[in-house]
């Protein structure tokens, strides 16, 4: 939505890049992760995914991802790709550990992974009928924190090396409540976390917005009824410019 729809594969590629980086990170540190430490590792990684999802959203909505014919385009979209990839680093590491350290067979773990992915796809479609995309992203982070709560119940979660005091990585229940509350509150206001620039247009978040609806790949916002010259693509040079009542759709 922040850019143009043909960049959907760019977003998917950023997600796959993050997951691959997470899996490689686990592989290069394979001696550090054992079957006994799996509950704690999955708990911390799920919490990391939840926190990174919220922080990534906060950065992403501030980026002016507009298509400009200058070298600025390269660092701009590089920054966007890295911001999008960070949460998936944690999810990729978690999936890699679940597949390689779990006491269950790979078939069972992979089936659970695919079932979760399918539920997530359908869940996003359902959630977007009730709230906006940034709020759904925050609620997705809450879902990851919920997974961390379940992982924590499977065994002890000792503090990670180098962490003297327990933080949110060790308190998935608190993280779940915070992200769920913020996600619900964000969906109840037009002044919450929202993109600054949408398809080359600066978002003003005016109170005159009459209707706003999101789906899996777009957003429609309708302004108030007003008098203005006809606004359309490819008008005839003979078309009258008499102002008419119309609404602005973005």
Model-derived segments and spans:
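Alpha-helical transmembrane segments of multi-pass membrane proteins
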Residues: 1-249
